Amino acid sequence: MLPLLLASSSAYRRELLSRLRLPFTCCSPDIDESHRPGESATALVKRLAEEKARALASSHPAHLIIGSDQVAVLGERIIGKPHTFEKARQQLLDASGASVTFLTGLALLNSQTGHCQVDCVPFTVNMRTLDSTRIERYLHAEQPYDCAGSFKAEGLGVSLFQSTAGSDATSLIGLPLIRLVDMLLAEGVETP
């Protein structure tokens, strides 16, 4: 089996990948993550996932490189990482009582052959109606400023959800393991 490399510095993705009990290393790619004019949210996350994997190919020949990227979509608007309390507060106020779809782009690049599998896995959450007090309590407790849409689903963020719909709950955290296992199997990698 070619060595696995996770093209990410995300602790959340690292924890998810470790669930497969396969040895892997991590390396953070340096790419421009800007949204291109006219680019759909699906095209954006697929492109960024592949670019993250390809950015490490020359320095990691003969590896299986996993790239992933996620955005949240509210209506027609892409909402990314808020980075600040005020932006997170506004994102959650906007999402109150609405449906938010998380799109997670996933790429598995065989840097030996150049073959790359790319997909996008959606996961929808229906938000509870949230007031400012609840939002601020959540933000102070969780500080989800590095999470798309200000939702930290692996923590208290799940308390903001009324219901969820999707084929792979791990995609909500940023690495869709069910789809990744399919891709790994296509490369001849069996999970324990």
From Swiss-Prot:
Its EC number is 3.6.1.-. The record marks 12, 70, 154 as: Important for substrate specificity. Keywords: Cytoplasm, Hydrolase, Nucleotide metabolism. InterPro entries: ITPase-like_fam, Maf-like. GO terms for molecular function: nucleoside triphosphate diphosphatase activity. Signal peptide: none annotated. Its cofactor is a divalent metal cation. It comes from the Bacteria. It is found in: Cytoplasm. One of its GO terms (biological process) is nucleotide metabolic process. It is an enzyme of class 3 (hydrolase). GO terms for cellular component: cytoplasm. Pfam families: Maf. It catalyses: N(7)-methyl-GTP + H2O = N(7)-methyl-GMP + diphosphate + H(+). The active site is at residue 69. Nucleoside triphosphate pyrophosphatase that hydrolyzes 7-methyl-GTP (m(7)GTP). May have a dual role in cell division arrest and in preventing the incorporation of modified nucleotides into cellular nucleic acids. NCBIfam families: maf (TIGR00172). Belongs to the Maf family. YceF subfamily. This is 7-methyl-GTP pyrophosphatase.
